[in-house]
């Protein structure tokens, strides 16, 4: 019977029996881990404890029910300072305690020295310390109070202005008030465009048989005041800005050929006035004509380069070209009266941008009034100068109020069959006198006027 048993089945039964025995021996609670699992070098990622890994059944995170709640150990009274003691006073302090005591005594000794110095500088008698300890705070009150006057802070700051420029600007603004009030918008636009160029030249005289244009302005026109002086009879000399301030005219005199390259303004000429009654020492006044031509375009250069200052001996050519709309470049009168027709309009229509109208604004000057005069012969490059006609001459006079006046010195050889009353209102009164000997103005006077006028021109641009 025993031989019939299979040995394999016997072995299987033995293994089963051993496993059952092991299961019976296992405790009901958590099984203690084998010694190989308790390695202090291992750390659990779940609970963060050392000695096991996250796979181990010993981890309390996996078998939380079997984990023991940590119990508190007993209280230790020595840890908490429930009854603080008083600071101990040692009889023999150490070296560190001695340094602390010396530092506390030093500021106490320096306090009376500081008080004595403060009383010396402030000049106040020493105050007795109060028993309640308020003396220390009251003794330093004089440091907070300033002994000198307190500074006054003002928000409005006035700019520093040169007194000379202030006087000039006040006089200019008072003179411009009535003129600017009556200007039309078109006139104000032309005035603002020409203000950067300084006071322009005025037309002081023209040939009797030469046409002069006029422009109709919309609205009111400013009145130009003419003040008669003792140097010109019958009030025939019109006020002209100082010749020294005409730097643009000096530039034109230095470069007469550059005028042909500038843009031109075309206008129809008015009927000329007759000069057959003129002679040596005769006076002529111009007035408005019976007809006015159409409005001519006005060209104003807003940005001009800086004009170089030339010598004081050169008389500006634009002194006779600075009228209300400028005078023509060709001032040489034709020899015959038949050339005054439509053939002269191309020559008279050429104008330069510098001859823009501007209001008569002249700052006051403190230079002495010298009744000097200077005659200048104007050179022309026109075709009419080859016909044997005499050139025009301009006489500049210095008035009493520091201004300059100019008058034409024309020969009596020019005649015209036109009536003398047709050209009476085209320009203010201009006197035309006979040729006189050339009296030279001292160069220093002209150069001084040039410097004064340039400074006034800069002040005008700053004010506007």
Swiss-Prot record:
InterPro entries: FAM90, Znf-CCHC_6. Pfam families: zf-CCHC_6. Signal peptide: none annotated. Residues 1-42, 70-389, 411-437 are annotated as: Disordered. It comes from the Eukaryota. Residues 180-197 have a biased composition (Low complexity). Residues 74-89, 97-114 have a biased composition (Basic and acidic residues). Belongs to the FAM90 family. This is Protein FAM90A9. It comes from Homo sapiens.
